[in-house]
């Protein structure tokens, strides 16, 4: 069963280096050939897949017209990895946010969005300082070092989160509360020589709760399109806007509860990842047997590889640092089709979500790249 290949599609991590290069920052070039700019912004619409946009083009005519080509987000196709790609210009094998949850040796399994233990909910900021988990220079720090103002325009609720600290250090944070001030603050930043990252989360939320393509999701997509139109209409001369996403989404129709599957628990000491993309951490010497068991039980419902094979296949990017390697499961399982690997007791909330993402399918991997110029 062949894993889909996207090598000829630009990576999400290339977008910000390309924008910084357009702003004249030395050494920055994402290979996207953007024109010289006075100010630039990347607007990330959480959960907006390329295929979803194509399927619902009538709900988003502005985005559809601007989005002439897709990006690939890399593995796993999840928010922590996508936000880190924006914040570093790198793939997960280098920035280290290898999942919604992943093991950090000596500290158990970290929930990267909440920065808490995925096992007992304890706060891990003290044990795992954000800038130690992700120590690489951020794109915002690189912009600021070149004398360009760097700003983040996002929900005020995210202003002091650990993930923000790990991936957006060096930026001035402009906390907003709704679509109106998201557009207004973005245009305010773009009025001077600056780089801006703006973020909208609610499309992803409604996709999880009601399903991607549901009526609620489509109504939100219409609001997103109006947001983009409002920013595009107000772009000052010399400004460039790039609208992207961190992942697509699928509706999960078949679930397997790992907690009720003894053959999938044998030799396993911990789980990371999420419903569509699992890190499986094994007992010493058990990896080969775990791979065999998971392949036997899951069959064509998932791609199952031992860590080194997943790395060699490029799942986590062209290179994986020694710092990041132990965070990747001894075994990695990526769901195909509309299948999900749930943990009904340990992850009750996640189990009951309608829409899911994380895997390697084109519905999850491909996102729009929409470019507008003032």
Please describe what each predicted stretch is.
Residues 1-374:
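Feature captures the catalytic ectodomains and active-site-proximal regions of enzymes
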């Amino acid at each position: 069963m062949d894993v889909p290949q996207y090598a000829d599609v630009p990576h999400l991590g290339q977008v910000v280096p390309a924008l910084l290069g357009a702003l004249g920052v030395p050494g920055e070039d994402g290979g996207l050939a953007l024109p010289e700019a006075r100010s630039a912004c990347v607007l990330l619409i959480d959960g907006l897949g390329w295929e979803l946009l194509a399927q619902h083009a009538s709900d988003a005519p502005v985005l559809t017209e601007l989005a002439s080509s897709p990006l690939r987000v890399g593995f796993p196709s999840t928010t922590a990895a996508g936000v880190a790609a924006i914040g570093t210009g790198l793939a997960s094998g280098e920035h280290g946010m290898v999942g919604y949850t992943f093991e950090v040796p000596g500290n158990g399994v970290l929930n990267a969005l909440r920065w808490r233990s995925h096992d007992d909910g304890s706060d891990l900021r003290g044990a795992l300082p954000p800038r130690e988990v992700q120590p690489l220079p951020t794109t915002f720090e690189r912009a600021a070092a070149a004398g360009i103002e760097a700003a983040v325009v996002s929900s005020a609720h995210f202003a002091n989160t650990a993930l923000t600290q790990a991936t957006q250090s060096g930026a001035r944070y402009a906390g907003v509360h709704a679509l109106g001030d998201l557009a207004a603050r973005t245009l305010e930043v773009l009025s001077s020589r600056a780089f801006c990252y703006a973020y909208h989360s609610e499309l992803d939320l409604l996709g999880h709760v009601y399903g991607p393509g549901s009526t609620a999701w489509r109504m939100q997509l219409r609001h997103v399109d109006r947001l983009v139109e409002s920013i595009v209409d107000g772009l000052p001369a010399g400004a460039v806007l790039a609208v992207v996403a961190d992942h697509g989404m699928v509706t999960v129709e078949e679930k397997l509860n790992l907690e009720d599957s003894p053959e999938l628990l044998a030799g396993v000491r911990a789980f990371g990842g999420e419903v569509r993309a699992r890190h499986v951490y094994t007992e010493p010497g058990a990896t080969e047997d775990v791979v065999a068991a998971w392949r036997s039980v899951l069959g064509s419902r998932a791609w199952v590889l031992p860590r080194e094979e997943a790395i060699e296949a490029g799942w986590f990017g062209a290179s994986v640092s020694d710092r990041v390697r132990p965070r990747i499961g001894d075994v990695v399982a990526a769901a195909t089709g509309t299948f999900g690997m749930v943990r009904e007791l340990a992850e009750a909330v996640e189990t009951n979500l309608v829409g899911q993402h994380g895997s390697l399918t084109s519905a999850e991997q491909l996102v729009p790249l929409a470019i507008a110029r003032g």
